C-alpha cells in the first residue's frame, strides 16, 4: 500500500513539473539592444531593435547597466516623450533588471538619469495581443422525437341495431361489424363526432351502426367503426343514432368500408372479424361493452340502442348522453427527448501540456508496476 502511495505522489510531482515547464516554455527573454547593455550610445538604436522583434505576453526584457549611476524606469507615454523621471510607474536600479511584459500593448522605458534619457536612452516595446484560438461553432443537436407506443386495441364490439328513428325504410335485422382497426400506432383524431343526416350509403345490405360501448379511441386517422362519416369522438360526446334524422340505418350518412373514401377500418391491414361483446379500444383499460362509460357509471353508453326489433317504429325518446371515456383519458403525446448541450472546445497550451503530463505519468506508473 505504501509503495502505491509513493508511486502516486511521485507521479503527481512529475505531472506538476511538466505542467510548469510547458506553461513557461513559450516565454522568451530578450536582451535589450541585442546584448542587454543599457547605455547612452548603444550599438543599435533601441527602438530599431524593438521593431525587429515580436514580443508576446509573459516575455521579459533584460537590462544591464552601472548600478548607482543609471537605472531603468517604466513610465507613461507623456513622461516618455518629455523624459520626466519624477513620476515612474516602476523603477529598477539594481544594475541587472528583468522586466516581465505581463500584458499586451505598449511599454515605455527611459533611463533614470534625465540627461541620458535626453540623449536617446529610451525604449518603446509593443506587446502583441493574446490570440485565443477560435472555438469550433457549437452545433445544437436536433431534438429527436421518440415515437409513442399506443396500446394494443381489441376489436370493437358487435353493434346492435340503432334506436328507432323516423325513417322511410326498414333497417336490416342483422348487421356485421367491420373489421377491427389495425394494431398500429397513428395519431388520435380530435374532431367531434356528429352524425349528419340525409346522406345515402353505398352499403345496401349491411350497415354497421354504432357499437354498444363508447366509441373506440383508436390511434389511427380512421373514422369510427360505425358507418358514419363522423370522426372518432376523442374529446366531445357523440350523439346517439337515435337523434340522427337520417332516413334509415341502411341510408346512414356513412360510407361503406368497401366504397367509402373515408379511412374506414375495413381498409386496415387487420382482417379479423369483430366478436360480440369484446372490449372496445381506448387509451385506458377498456370497459365491458354491457357496462356504462367508466367516467359515468350511472349512464349508459353514448351509442347503446335498443334491439333491431324495436327499430321499426319511430321513437321520440332520446338516449342519455354520456361523455366518452377518451375525454378524461390522457393520450400519449409525442415525447421530446432533451438535447444534449453543445460543448465548446477551446485549445489552450496548459490543457495540452496537462494531457501530455498525464500520459507521461501514466507511462511512468505503468513501468514501475510492470
UniProtKB/Swiss-Prot annotation:
Instruction: Tell me the InterPro entries matching this sequence.
Output: Cupredoxin, ENL_dom, Phytocyanin-like, Phytocyanin_dom
Key words, A-Z:
Cell membrane, Disulfide bond, Glycoprotein, GPI-anchor, Lipoprotein, Membrane, Signal
Per UniProt, the ranges with Pro residues bias are 291-305
Q: Which residues form the propeptide?
A: 346-370
Q: According to the UniProt entry, which residue ranges have a biased composition of type Low complexity?
A: 135-175, 195-205, 215-290, 306-318
Q: What are the annotated glycosylation sites? A: 58, 334
Can you tell which superkingdom this protein's organism belongs to?
Eukaryota
Leader sequence residues: 1-27
Q: Which residues form the Phytocyanin domain?
A: 28-129
Tissue specificity, per the record, is:
Mostly expressed in stems, leaves and flowers, and, to a lower extent, in seedlings, roots and seeds.
The terms under GO molecular function for this entry are: electron transfer activity
The record describes its membrane topology as: Lipid-anchor; GPI-anchor
Residue ranges of the region described as Disordered: 135-347
Return the Polar residues bias intervals.
176-194, 319-334
- Does the keyword Lipoprotein feature in the UniProt annotation? yes
Role description:
May act as a carbohydrate transporter.
For this chain, the family text in UniProt reads: Belongs to the early nodulin-like (ENODL) family.
Protein's name according to its UniProt entry: Early nodulin-like protein 1
Amino acid at each position: 500500500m505504501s509503495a502505491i502511495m509513493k508511486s502516486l505522489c511521485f507521479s503527481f510531482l512529475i505531472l506538476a513539473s511538466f505542467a510548469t515547464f510547458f506553461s513557461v516554455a513559450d516565454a522568451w527573454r530578450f536582451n535589450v539592444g541585442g546584448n542587454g547593455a543599457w547605455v547612452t550610445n548603444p550599438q543599435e538604436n533601441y527602438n530599431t531593435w524593438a521593431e525587429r522583434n515580436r514580443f508576446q505576453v509573459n516575455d521579459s526584457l533584460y537590462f544591464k547597466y552601472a548600478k548607482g549611476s543609471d537605472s531603468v524606469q517604466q513610465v507613461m507615454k507623456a513622461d516618455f516623450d518629455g523624459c520626466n523621471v519624477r513620476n515612474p510607474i516602476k523603477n529598477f536600479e539594481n544594475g541587472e533588471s528583468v522586466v516581465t511584459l505581463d500584458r499586451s500593448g505598449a511599454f515605455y522605458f527611459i533611463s533614470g538619469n534625465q540627461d541620458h534619457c535626453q540623449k536617446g536612452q529610451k525604449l518603446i516595446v509593443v506587446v502583441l495581443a493574446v490570440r485565443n484560438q477560435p472555438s469550433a461553432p457549437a452545433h445544437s443537436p436536433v431534438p429527436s422525437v421518440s415515437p409513442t407506443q399506443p396500446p394494443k386495441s381489441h376489436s370493437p364490439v358487435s353493434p346492435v341495431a340503432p334506436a328507432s328513428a323516423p325513417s322511410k325504410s326498414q333497417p336490416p335485422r342483422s348487421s356485421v361489424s367491420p373489421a377491427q382497426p389495425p394494431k398500429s400506432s397513428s395519431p388520435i383524431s380530435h374532431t367531434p363526432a356528429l352524425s349528419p343526416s340525409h346522406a345515402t350509403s353505398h352499403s345496401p345490405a349491411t350497415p354497421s351502426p354504432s357499437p354498444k360501448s363508447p366509441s373506440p379511441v383508436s390511434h389511427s386517422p380512421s373514422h369510427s367503426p360505425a358507418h358514419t362519416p363522423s370522426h372518432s369522438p376523442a374529446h366531445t360526446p357523440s350523439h346517439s343514432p337515435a337523434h340522427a334524422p337520417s332516413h334509415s340505418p341502411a341510408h346512414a350518412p356513412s360510407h361503406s368500408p368497401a366504397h367509402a373514401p373515408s379511412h374506414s377500418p375495413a381498409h386496415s391491414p387487420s382482417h379479423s372479424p369483430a366478436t360480440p361483446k369484446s372490449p372496445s379500444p381506448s387509451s385506458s383499460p377498456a370497459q365491458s361493452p354491457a357496462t356504462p362509460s367508466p367516467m359515468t357509471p350511472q349512464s349508459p353508453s353514448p351509442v347503446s340502442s335498443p334491439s333491431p326489433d324495436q327499430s321499426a317504429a319511430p321513437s321520440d325518446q332520446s338516449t342519455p348522453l354520456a361523455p366518452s371515456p377518451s375525454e378524461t383519458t390522457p393520450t400519449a403525446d409525442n415525447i421530446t427527448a432533451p438535447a444534449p448541450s453543445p460543448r465548446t472546445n477551446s485549445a489552450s497550451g496548459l490543457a495540452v501540456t496537462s494531457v501530455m503530463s498525464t500520459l507521461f505519468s501514466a507511462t511512468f506508473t505503468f513501468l514501475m508496476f510492470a
